[in-house]
Amino acid sequence: LVSKGAQRIDAASLDNAQGIVSGESDVTLSIAGKLDNGQGGLVSAQRALSFERDDTLLNNAGGRINGGSLLLKGASLDNSDGQLISQSRLDAILGGALVNAGAARLASGGDLLLRSASVDNRGGKLVSQGLLEISAGSLDNSASGTLAGQADMSLRLGGGALRNQQDGLIFSQAGALEVQAGSLDNRQGTLQAQGDNRLRIGGALDNQGGRLDSRAGNLDLQSGSLDNGAGGVLNSAKGWLKLVTGLFDNSAGVTQAQSLEIRAGQGVRNQQGHLSALGGDNRIVTADFDNQGGGLYASGLLSLDGQRFLNQGAAAGQGGKVGAGRIDFSLAGALANRFGQLESESELHLRAAAIDNSGGSLRALGRSGSTRLVAGDLNNAYGVLESANQDLDLQLSSLANAGGRILHTGNGTFGLDSGQVIRAGGELTTNGLLDIRASEWTNSSVLQAGRLNLDIGTFRQTAEGKLLAVQSFTGRGGDWSNDGLLASDGSLRLDLSGGYRGNGRATSLGDFALNAASLDLGNAASLAGGANVTLGAGNLLVNRGRITAAGDLVASAASLNNYGTLGGGG
């Protein structure tokens, strides 16, 4: 049936299999029942092509339907291995299913608006050169199916499922993509937009091995849960990524954006995963965050509010890694960083019920600001806590530092309770002031400070113990026994109401002063000053070791027994 003018067909049914219905003007088909255009059939119009009845059962399997513009109404459409093409706008309104599977192609040169009970596009192509809008109960674009639009795309499925697994592609070339569905299966599939990519998924979003991309816009995701494991990718190359979900699983996956806002009420799993932000402030609110063997990075602020943060490993080098411009964690539970790494380019603030940094490292590299740890227990055994910030503030119930190092290279306050310092063990170093007060202390650790002030009633230092000062060392107390090292690169002054004894060394590069009720120096003991040395003993001064001064040496005592060396250079 071929016409040069307008053509209209009204029938109860039409069998056009292997046939032709064609017009050089408008063509209108009003078919009450089945319209069969399969097996190479052709229906075409150079101008408007209209299927105007809602009850048409249209079979275009292996057939061709072409129009200058196309309005398609019907009960259902089977376009398997067929072609349905409009040179401009295409409107399709179906009460039942659209099947566009296999080698099928459904395309428009302008906007494409489709409404259907369901869409089966497995292996098919559904393409618009303009706007693409689909409203359906469900949509299956799996098995290398393609949904593509030149401009904005909108997929509205209500509570129905969107299937895009097995190399399915949903792509907005120059616009935004908006998806609303009950669930989304995007395993090994791709949803991509040049602009914003906005997904509202009521239930599970499975992106294992798949990609959710925004090339130049933002990635805005809401779902009941999100599985981005097994090499899945969430990518907002030039914009932010916002995620609101239940459980967010990024195990062995990649999530990256310019900035991140993640709210995962049931937790985040990032084992062997990569989660990063290239700039801006970033916030994560969750339950437990499992980063074992994973990487969490941000160029700007990384703020995390949650229950536990699990960053530990079984051995050195196997823990998780966290790096950010600034780190601020607030945890109701524990921070587990055994063999893990947390590093801030500026400030480091951690609040947790307990912190386990055994074998791990906590570092703040900025020269200003503060490092602040607020916790019940801090276990830093064989670990490293290092801060270049102005101030280091440790608010702890207990500190275990055996074999560990706490290093503060800033010049401000070293805030740690004296009781924690004397019980900690390991090495403690600060360029600032370290003020220790205790009634009794036995030291076998290494402590270093810019300025070291001690007020200790009874002090014992083993041969392994070292107390070191860069600028000044000031000590007060009762009875002191020193078998280790007391040293200052500046001045050193000790004022004791009791005695000073032992086989240890006390030395300064500047002036040295020691006043005590008595002095009893063993064979291996030494007192040495790089400038003047002043010694005062209210009672007996016994020297079996060495007492030397680069400048003047002044010693006064009620009684002096010298079996060693007394020497001054002044």
Question: Language model features by range: what are they?
Answer:
Residues 1-2, 16-22, 37-43, 58-65, ...:
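Short, T/G/N/S-enriched strand-turn elements that build extracellular solenoid repeat scaffolds
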Residues 5-12, 25-32, 43, 47-57, ...:
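Well-ordered beta-strand segments characteristic of repetitive beta-sheet solenoids
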